[in-house]
Structure formats: structure tokens, C-alpha cells
A protein has these predicted regions:
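N-terminal redox-cofactor-binding region of secreted/periplasmic oxidoreductases
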Residues: 1-552
Length: 552
């Protein structure tokens, strides 16, 4: 097949969103020879704050630094957590959220995907998903039964773990009785390990770096600074996308084959509803003609964490900034040699809060400094103690609570109403409470050699209901929203296992919004995998990669 670049504003495929899934599916489709236009509302990812892994800390701690790369969403007041409005960072930049996240690389538990398949989602079982992961990975240990090599996304371990990090790993094994894992992304996830990251050689390996910049297929065109207003649907078929660019000019991009939405759990659901696909009554409330009555925006869920911070005596464990400035100078002079060449997270554990659990229901992220999450009185302020410290983000990875995403208006520039309904199911609070007590057991271990001085937050005297109250005051999101365009074979599904939107031809959704249920761990790697597997689904169509773009 002859490769041919997009002609003007027309291509075989128009992909909305250049994030984790969008970059992956667009890169693979273009690699096959198909012409692809990717629409991105944000600007270039070739910025120091984006490229240097360790700068993700100050980026998220200082709102002014993050603002150029973030949609800046907030949830509606969350009535089960003291009516707090939670920040919902979403990448508004080439690479999407993969350009501003913590670069933690977690595939998820194999049982997650077998569960999807058991619900009727053929082709999404653990073995099928493993094949997609292997295609996308370039793991530092090389290829094996469960890991890939030579793919677009480089995956490495943190090479500069601090003393407290190594003590934490041993303490977790001692206190919980779990295994110290060499690779939690292989056959078994349960245990404690050094963190894996999609970063290498001092650079963030976002989806855009791997699939757009490095693959660089000639038939791929990225249009940045372009906001998608709605999908253009004619006679029940998606034929293009109406957009407005940075100058305010409005135009339509035509798709000869398919329109693919990869705008994430917020953007894809919002765009479907603006295009007439969603709950009929809700669309009518906003004066939108109904083209397909589907449960768009339902099934919203997310990972939530509660941070515990401990003051340590070790002089080898860093405090918080100003050491960022020193590290930045070293990193600029000798790339890849300072802690700024790595993710801010250094260790991870996947544990069971109950032996009755079939898979680990708790994830611990270790930060080598003090970090206290925002409280209800200061929703965007990060309180940071300057003393050497270790912080554990005690994370609920299988929430039972479910929320919704709805339109605030028919204006595509208006932020939607994001209601996670955090902790609406009491079982979620109990897991966070049990997990917090487990973290205390870990930090009481002799493996720390007496270096733990005190519990800075929430405070060792807090137990029972007082601890639960502290969790309600401080628990917040890990920014892993999923599920608003649920994949399935029943009436609660928005897309089928082929990612095609029910009732509309030529339209797919390919991102974390399609997850029937959230994966066990950080969701960036699964989102990239969804793009990788989604490309195979598109190309498996009889004329999936054939050129249909018209033009002279």
C-alpha cells in the first residue's frame, strides 16, 4: 500500500486527542500507511517541565507551572468527603496526561483483564492484553514471556533509590510477609518492589514521545491548539469533526474511514454528548438533538489515596525543595545522572487488606520526602514539611463507589460536571482505613533501624473514627478517572469490544473511558495498551489500513 499524508483537512482517520491512547492508536494506524490527523487542544510537549521526569513534582505543586499544560478541571463538591471539590488534572498538551503524570508504569493485575473478557469483551483477556503490552514496551531487562523489548515506550527502574526507599522495601516484606518482587508487571503483582517508570536517559517517555516523535510516521499530522466542538454525523455515520482553532476559525476535518475519540474520560464523554450521543433526557435539557440514547458519562470511578508522612533521621534522605534547583543544574549539565532523571516515586507495593481478597486491593506509592495532600480549606495548596521524610500514598485500587459526568451546558468550552461520588460506598473508606494501619505496621519495622522519628500526618494518636475523619479531610484522587464510555455487550455499554460506539457507524472511542472497571494500579500504561490494541482492532477491518483519503 502506498503511504500518503493527509490532504488538507481530510484523512482516513481523524483522532481526537494526542494522549496516552490517542498517540498510540494514531501512531500505529499511520505506521500501517493510513493517513491520520490528530487533533490536540494543547500545545507542544517539547518543554523542559514536561521532558524532565523529576520536575513533575514542582509542576504539580505550583499551579502556575502546571496551568499551561492542564485543563484545570475540578469536581463538583463531593458530599461524602466533606463537600470538597477535588482537582482533576488532565493534560492539555501533546501527549495528554502522559506528558504531566508521575510516569509510574503499572500494567494492572492480569485478573482485571480476564474479568473484562468474562463480561463478554472478547479479545481483552489477560493473554491478548499481554501481547499488546509486549508490542508497546521497551523494557530494560529485555523480552520475556511477559515483557516486551524494542517497542515505543521505554520502561526502566529507578536507578537512584534513596536509603529510606530500600529500608521501606525490606520493612514491607518483613511486616506484611510479602515477597520482594523483581518485576511486578510480570506474572504476579502481589508484593513490594522498586518502582518502574516510563522514563529513560533523563527523559519522560510519554505516549507522544514514543508513538509520535520517535515513530514519526510520514502519514501522521498533529494539529495542536485545536478544540473539537462536535463529531459531524450524517445519516448515522461519523464523517468528521467540527473544530475551532487558536485564532477562533471554525472548520471541519473529514474522515474517510473513521473518527476516533481518545480525549480521555472527560473529553470523550463530553464530546459524545455534544454530538448527540448520551442520555436522551440530559441532551434535551441542553437543546441537543438526540442521535443515540446511550449511558454516556455513567460508571465514572477513580483511585483515591490517603497520605501518611513520617519524619526520618537519615541525612541521606532528601527534604523538599530547594534541592530541586541543585538537581536541575546537575541534570542540565549531565543528563540522566540526577534524581530529576527519574519519576518522583521510588517504590511500590500491592497488598491485600484482607486475606479473603482474591487480588491485592491496596497500592502503596512511596515518595522520598514529605507530602501532605490538600485539605478542605486549601484545595489547591500542597502543605510540605522541609524535614527529611518518607510519604506513602495509601491507595484504594478497586473502588466500589461510582459517579457521573454530565454537561454543564452545550458550550464545548464549558467544563463538564464531574461527580466521582468518592467514598459513597462505605467499603471504600474501610479499605483506606485498613491500609493506613498497615502502613503504620510497616514503619514500625526494625528494617528502618530506628530512623523513623515521628508520624507527621495524620498523627499516630489518631485511630478508629478519628483516623477515618482524617481520611475524609485529606484523601484525594490519584487522577485515574475511567469508565465514562463503558465497553461491554449489554445495555449499560457505550462501546462494544471493538470500541465502536453503539448505533453510530464510523465512530470509536479508544481511551481509559472504555474501561468497564478500573485496573489494579496506575492507569497510564493500560491507557497506552488500549491504544495499541485498538489500532489492531481498526486494522483488522477488511479495509482498515487502505487509503481512502480523497484529494488531488
Amino acid at each position: 500500500m502506498a503511504n500518503r499524508a493527509p490532504r488538507g483537512d481530510e484523512a482516513d482517520y481523524v483522532v481526537v486527542g494526542s494522549g496516552s491512547s490517542g498517540a498510540a492508536i494514531a501512531g500505529r494506524l499511520a505506521e500501517s500507511g493510513a493517513s491520520v490527523i490528530v487533533l490536540e487542544a494543547g500545545k507542544s510537549d517539547e518543554k523542559l517541565l514536561v521532558k524532565k521526569p523529576g520536575l513533575v513534582g514542582p509542576m504539580h505543586a505550583v499551579p502556575q507551572l502546571k496551568k499551561p499544560f492542564d485543563w484545570g478541571y475540578y469536581s463538583v463538591p463531593q458530599k461524602h468527603v466533606l463537600d470538597r471539590r477535588m482537582p482533576v488534572p488532565r493534560g492539555k498538551v501533546v501527549g495528554g496526561s502522559s506528558s504531566i503524570n508521575g510516569m509510574v508504569y503499572v500494567r494492572g493485575n492480569r485478573a482485571n483483564f480476564d474479568s473484562w473478557a468474562a463480561e463478554g469483551n472478547k479479545g481483552w483477556d489477560a493473554d491478548s492484553v499481554n501481547a499488546a503490552y509486549k508490542r508497546m514496551e521497551d523494557f530494560e531487562d529485555g523480552e520475556s514471556e511477559f515483557r516486551g523489548a524494542g517497542g515505543p515506550i521505554r520502561v526502566t527502574r529507578n536507578k537512584l533509590p534513596q536509603e529510606g526507599t530500600l529500608q521501606f522495601i525490606q520493612a514491607t516484606a518483613d511486616a506484611i510477609g510479602c515477597e520482594i518482587l523483581d518485576d511486578y508487571n510480570a506474572e504476579s503483582q502481589e508484593g513490594v518492589s522498586r518502582m518502574q517508570q516510563n522514563a529513560a536517559d533523563g527523559l519522560r517517555y510519554s505516549a507522544s514521545r514514543g508513538y509520535i516523535h520517535h515513530l514519526a510516521p510520514a502519514t501522521l499530522q498533529v494539529q495542536s491548539g485545536v478544540l473539537a466542538k462536535k463529531v459531524l454525523i450524517e445519516n448515522g455515520r461519523a464523517v468528521g469533526v467540527e473544530v475551532v482553532d487558536a485564532t477562533g476559525s471554525r472548520r471541519t476535518l473529514r474522515a474517510g474511514k473513521e473518527v476516533i475519540l481518545s480525549a480521555g474520560f472527560v473529553g470523550s464523554a463530553q464530546l459524545l454528548m455534544l454530538s448527540g450521543i448520551g442520555h436522551a433526557e440530559h441532551l434535551k435539557e441542553h437543546g441537543i438533538d438526540v442521535l443515540a440514547d446511550l449511558p454516556v458519562g455513567d460508571n465514572l470511578h477513580d483511585h483515591m489515596f490517603h497520605a501518611l508522612t513520617f519524619h526520618v533521621s537519615s541525612s541521606k534522605n532528601k527534604g523538599t525543595p530547594p534541592y530541586f534547583a541543585r538537581g536541575l543544574v546537575k541534570e542540565l549539565m549531565r543528563p540522566g545522572t540526577s534524581f530529576l532523571a527519574h519519576s518522583v516515586f521510588e517504590a511500590v507495593a500491592f497488598l491485600k487488606t484482607s486475606q479473603a481478597a482474591e487480588v491485592p486491593d491496596l497500592q502503596l506509592h512511596l515518595l522520598p520526602w514529605a507530602y501532605v495532600t490538600p485539605n478542605q480549606d486549601a484545595p489547591i495548596r500542597h502543605d510540605v514539611d522541609k524535614r527529611p521524610a518518607l510519604t506513602v500514598l495509601t491507595t484504594l485500587i478497586y473502588p466500589k463507589s461510582r459517579g457521573t459526568l454530565r454537561l454543564a451546558s452545550a458550550d464545548p468550552t464549558a467544563a463538564p460536571l464531574i461527580d466521582f461520588q468518592y467514598l459513597s460506598d462505605p467499603a471504600d473508606l474501610e479499605v483506606l482505613g485498613e491500609g493506613s494501619e498497615m502502613v503504620r505496621e510497616i514503619f514500625a519495622s526494625g528494617a528502618f533501624n530506628g530512623s523513623i522519628k515521628e508520624e507527621l500526618h495524620p498523627g499516630k494518636g489518631l485511630r478508629g473514627q478519628e483516623l477515618r475523619d482524617a481520611i475524609l479531610n485529606r484523601a484525594t484522587s490519584v487522577y485515574h478517572g475511567v469508565g465514562t464510555c463503558r465497553m461491554g455487550v449489554d445495555e449499560l455499554a457505550v462501546v462494544g469490544p471493538d470500541l465502536k460506539v453503539r448505533g453510530i457507524e464510523g465512530l470509536r472511542v479508544c481511551d481509559a473511558s472504555i474501561m468497564p472497571s478500573i485496573t489494579g494500579g496506575n492507569t497510564n500504561a493500560p491507557a497506552i495498551m488500549i491504544g495499541e490494541l485498538g489500532a489492531r482492532l481498526v486494522l483488522s477491518e477488511p479495509d482498515g489500513g487502505a487509503e481512502t483519503c480523497q484529494g488531488n
